[in-house]
């Protein structure tokens, strides 16, 4: 009887550990996504300031801004995919 109760307790703690691991992974991915959002916001703000100071450079500034934002989005997507893969591996 006691062995059955101990086994049930171990099973529930194992599921809890996997759930907390998945939670930690996704919180980490969320922090990465929030950092990327802040970075893209900084890029956009700086680009608008630069265009306001030097309107004739609008084309090159806009192109560089879009390239940098796309690279950041790519890394963000990569972090999200890795987080999902690790979470699904825990299950």
Regions found by a protein language model. Name each.
Residues 37-56:
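Juxtamembrane helix-loop transition segments at the membrane interface in multi-pass membrane proteins
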Residues 67-79:
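Membrane-embedded alpha-helical segments of transport systems
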Residues 56-67:
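Membrane-interface alpha-helices at helix entry/exit sites of multi-pass transporters
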Residues 30, 50-51, 64, 70:
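Amphipathic alpha-helical segments that mediate coupling or scaffolding at interfaces
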Residues 18-43:
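Short alpha-helical packing/oligomerization segments
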Residues 83-91:
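Juxtamembrane boundary at the C-terminal end of a transmembrane helix
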Residues 1-17:
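Short, strongly hydrophobic alpha-helical membrane anchors
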